[in-house]
Amino acid sequence: MQPFEKTPDAVTGRRISAVDYAKTFAILCVVVIHVSSEVLLGRQIGSAAWLEGLFWSSLARGAVPMFLMCSGALFMDRSGGLYVRHIWNRNIPHILIALFVWAAVYKVIPRFLHEKLTAEALHTILLELLRGQHEGHLYFLHIMLLVYAALPITYTFAAHADEKTERYALSFWILYGVLLPTLKSLGLLQAFSGIFLQWPLTLAWGAIGCTWLGHFLIKRKPLPVHLTAAMILIGFIICFAGTWPRSIRTGKLSAQLLEGLSPGPCFLAAGFFSLCIRIGKKENRKMERIAKALSSGSFCVYLVHLLVLRVLAHVGFSTSCFRPAVSVPFLTLLCLLGSYCIYLILKRIPWVNRWLI
């Protein structure tokens, strides 16, 4: 079997199981990233504790690309077709409402706890919401609005592109959405000027290409195990070994090789996503049910997990309790448990379940 060989039955229920596994792993990685960020930003650069935090953070950096790949796998390969009206009447309003409500929650709660909610404060909050000044991790919802808006175009392309065109599209995205933006962020394009500097795609537009990668992989047989392992290892090395010396040199966290759609996170995402496809091919009903339950709550967990982390910090749970090698996974599990409990409560409220989570 050759790598990237198409499967004869690309659109199957088994594919959905693979996406459930991927979403479950991706939300775990999201929480690891935010837990370990306390270590990367608060410990001495290059210390043993800092390196332990960098280890966990590097391993988890495929999270956002994996979520984008899941979107591509789900929405670009529908045998029943895609309806533009449904996107604009259901998907985009869902993201918009969730974005503004949860952005408001993240702004109101700190002010409510630490200062008075005056009319002036509420006016300031409203202006910040309208200007897009939202909690940092909600940037993903901004990206998803663009991904959904472009979906009728990308879906049509996916439905009609032949093998050669598919590979060309993927190569185009790797060059302009992954490599050039990374070189630019590292300052390696400073010698150039003019319109060339506008060639690299921004993260928002590059995300659309990442959904294509998910579609490309899901409708093919799983990559060989050795290739999957190599991609994960390469991605980790780029993130860990690339960030360590750069941070030592600058005296602060140099996160260019950890962020966005840089090569390290993309290698990790592609490797873990392919691993999930392989696991999804196996008959294990119990694991499938667990993955389905966890992935169903992944959007809610993404939205609320920072609130849970702040509550945990308030009651004394942080990465400083013990070494990051242990405290990062421990706090991650606590945060996931608390966030998922919130999901189980909120999903019982019909309009909240429909529009906010």
Where are these regions (language model features)?
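Membrane-cytosol interface segments of multi-pass membrane proteins
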Residues: 1-176, 287, 319-357
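Alpha-helical transmembrane segments and terminal signal-anchor/GPI-anchor hydrophobic tails
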Residues: 7-9, 222-289
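Aromatic-anchored segments of alpha-helical transmembrane domains
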Residues: 28-35, 103-104, 171-185, 233-247, ...
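Membrane-interface helix termini and inter-helical loops of multi-pass transporters
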Residues: 42-47, 118-120, 124, 186-195, ...
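Interfacial loop-to-helix transition and helix-capping segments at the boundaries
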Residues: 54-64, 129-143, 184-209, 240-271
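Transmembrane alpha-helical segments
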Residues: 71-75, 146, 150-157, 209-221, ...
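Long hydrophobic alpha-helical segments that form multi-pass transmembrane helix bundles
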Residues: 164-220, 231
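Extracellular/periplasmic helix-loop-helix junctions in multi-pass membrane proteins
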Residues: 247-257, 285-287, 291, 310-331
